[in-house]
Amino acid sequence: MANLQSFERTDYQQVKADLHRKILDRLDLEKLGKATGDSARDEVLVVIRNAVNGEVVPLSFAERERLSREILDEIFGLGPLEPLLKDHTVSDILVNKFDRVYIERAGKLELTGLSFKDNAHLMQIIERIVSRVGRRVDESSPMVDARLADGSRVNAIIPPLAIDGPCLSIRRFGREPVTARQMLENQTLTESMLELLSAMVKGRLNILVSGGTGAGKTTLLNVLSGYIPNSDRIVTIEDAAELQLKQEHIVRLETRPPNIEGKGAVRQRQLVINSLRMRPDRIVVGEVRGEEAFDMLQAMNTGHEGSLTTVHANSPRDAMARVENMVSMANLNIPERAVRHQIASAVHAVVQIARLSDGTRKVMTISEVTGMDEGSIAMQDIFSFDRTAVDENGKVRGVFRATGVRPQFAERLATGGSRLRPALFESKTEV
């Protein structure tokens, strides 16, 4: 890389931009449009290599090959982002500025050496992403959500809202969903906790998965949904389709943002209401964020038990408060006490998950909602993770603990055929 290091970044980017323009002038774009993906890429790569090898620049053969690949990515892909999108260990791509590209790998953020040429180059890639899904981003509409072909979730925000230039965030999703076995291997939870959670799902308890940004709520929801019997009819509702359920009888619904004229939006609440007319056995909502919380509670309370959803909150009690606030967004003027009664009646358990400072994810608590206590929602922890220390390498140490509490819903599960081992609830700790 010595040649590339001595060859100033600005010069390298300029040569790449100049070659990009020259190559586009040489290509028969109409002919390429009729070619298949692989044959078109191969044909363009030959043109690119000829153009690169014709340039008098201090680059080795390997560096010229890299330059050729980067120009190919500019023409067919998403420029500097392409190598990151091909790296399955990358879970998030965060572009703060054109020359500040971060990734999350194994729960840790790291700065890459990748860069766009300038803000205009970054803006060009953002426009390419959103145009592929029929969206637009400009000064009149400076925020946009989109999805890549592989299911990755994209958010872009541009000036004047983004002061330092366009920003791009991409949440990646693996081709194969994380399994329960992998969560055990990663020590996200214990065998005993998983045994309880699987019984709760099979026993048709309504479960709320709570956690902060990047905590792994959707991953856990996907694992829990895997325990829904194959005979059940499932309707999933999401802002951006992320769940990867394997059951046969499943209907996937997704919200729709407004079009260029600001019309045609379909919100989660509309989909939840519509799903009730689709004879679902289970309703799985990717994340409740607003007024749809009321309709979700109604569904849980009126024959659609065994439903699952997630909420953005930092503790089980915060999750209850968040749901209460979201119900108020429906503007139905229901008294607070009545709302709490409805929540306590609808939600059987809250599973709190968190991403710790070392990047690992842990199920922090499995809590039962036991009813009302003097006007407040009463809860009790069944399992918890207790942090004990952070070692010299920054690794969080702790133990999973069974609190010794036998949940009230154990009898309900037994009646439904899911009899839990008494030893499951004996007070004990597991590393």
Where are these regions (language model features)?
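Walker A (P-loop) phosphate-binding loop of P-loop NTPases
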Residues: 214
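P-loop NTP-binding catalytic core
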Residues: 87, 95, 100-203, 421
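Switch/coupling sub-region of P-loop NTPases
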Residues: 194, 198-210, 223-346, 352-354
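Active-site phosphate-binding and catalytic loops of NTP-dependent enzymes
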Residues: 31-34, 54-61, 76-87, 129-146, ...
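Conserved phosphate/pyrophosphate-binding and hydrolysis machinery centered on Walker-type P-loop NTPases
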Residues: 9-13, 33-42, 57-68, 83-91, ...
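Conserved lysine of the Walker
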Residues: 217
